[in-house]
């Protein structure tokens, strides 16, 4: 099961007493700030959670798995997330559902 933005907003309503509309706006604005910072090329550091940054990937040859045909994979920019030590410690012994 995945945690959704709606569930995050509902948690703010239940645990913090936020109005439902305000909680939804809060969650939306939180993620918009992350997106906006990354669009500007800035790193996003969330203490105790982790860092989001951009990484450039070079063009490279690839292979179509269905046909085996060689194709060119273009250069691109990707978002990477590096979890912080506190997050790594909390999830270290969590069993992953297959």
From Swiss-Prot:
Annotated keywords: DNA recombination, DNA-binding, Transcription, Transcription regulation, Translation regulation
A biological-process GO annotation: regulation of translation
Pfam families, per the entry: Bac_DNA_binding
Domain of life of the organism encoding this protein: Bacteria
CDD domains given in the database record: IHF_A
SMART domains according to UniProt: BHL (SM00411)
GO terms of molecular function: DNA binding; structural constituent of chromatin
Entry GO terms, CC: cytosol
InterPro entries: Hist_DNA-bd (IPR000119), Histone-like_DNA-bd_CS (IPR020816), IHF-like_DNA-bd_dom_sf (IPR010992), IHF_alpha (IPR005684)
Function text: This protein is one of the two subunits of integration host factor, a specific DNA-binding protein that functions in genetic recombination as well as in transcriptional and translational control.
Entries under NCBIfam families matching the protein: himA, PRK00285.1
Subunit relationships: Heterodimer of an alpha and a beta chain.
Protein family (similarity comment): Belongs to the bacterial histone-like protein family.
Name this polypeptide is given: Integration host factor subunit alpha
Organism: Actinobacillus pleuropneumoniae serotype 5b (strain L20)
């Amino acid at each position: 099961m995945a945690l959704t933005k709606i569930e995050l907003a509902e948690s703010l309503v239940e645990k913090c007493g936020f109005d439902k509309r305000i909680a939804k706006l809060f969650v939306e604005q939180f993620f918009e700030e992350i997106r906006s910072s990354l669009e500007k090329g800035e790193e996003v550091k969330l203490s105790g959670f982790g860092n989001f940054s951009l990484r450039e990937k070079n063009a490279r040859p690839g292979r179509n798995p269905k046909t085996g045909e060689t194709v060119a994979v273009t250069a691109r920019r990707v978002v990477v997330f590096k979890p912080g030590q506190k997050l790594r410690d909390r999830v270290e012994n969590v069993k992953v559902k297959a």
